[in-house]
């Protein structure tokens, strides 16, 4: 198709690691727009390895079922779908600094 690549962008829009309509529109519109390769955001391979609680996940078959819908749509538009696999390492966090804690500060007792 072409060499235009949509690089992974953290969207922080998943619930329990599942892609949703936001991802369908965000990624699908890039495929419709003509990009040759469209990569998802960083997808955690285990729930404890997420960068944030709102990250995309691929630690269960159910996650792949949802992602397959998006991938089939993008492929139907002529784009090659891809995924960025991720693990945040020893600094991984499933703590959100936003709800009720706008500073994002974690007390030492909490981790």
Which residue stretches match the model-derived regions?
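N-terminal capping/small domains of soluble enzymes
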Residues: 1-88, 95
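Non-globular sequence segments
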Residues: 72, 86-111
């Amino acid at each position: 198709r072409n060499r235009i690549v949509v690089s992974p962008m953290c969207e922080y829009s998943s619930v329990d690691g599942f892609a949703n309509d936001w991802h369908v529109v965000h990624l699908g519109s890039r495929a419709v727009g003509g990009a040759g390769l469209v990569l998802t955001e960083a997808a955690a391979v285990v729930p404890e390895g997420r960068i944030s609680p709102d990250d995309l996940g691929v630690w269960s078959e159910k996650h792949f079922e949802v992602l397959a819908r998006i991938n089939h749509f993008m492929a139907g538009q002529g784009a090659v779908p891809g995924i960025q696999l991720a693990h945040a390492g020893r600094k991984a966090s499933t703590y959100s600094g936003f709800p009720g804690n706008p500073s994002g500060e974690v007390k030492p007792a909490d981790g």
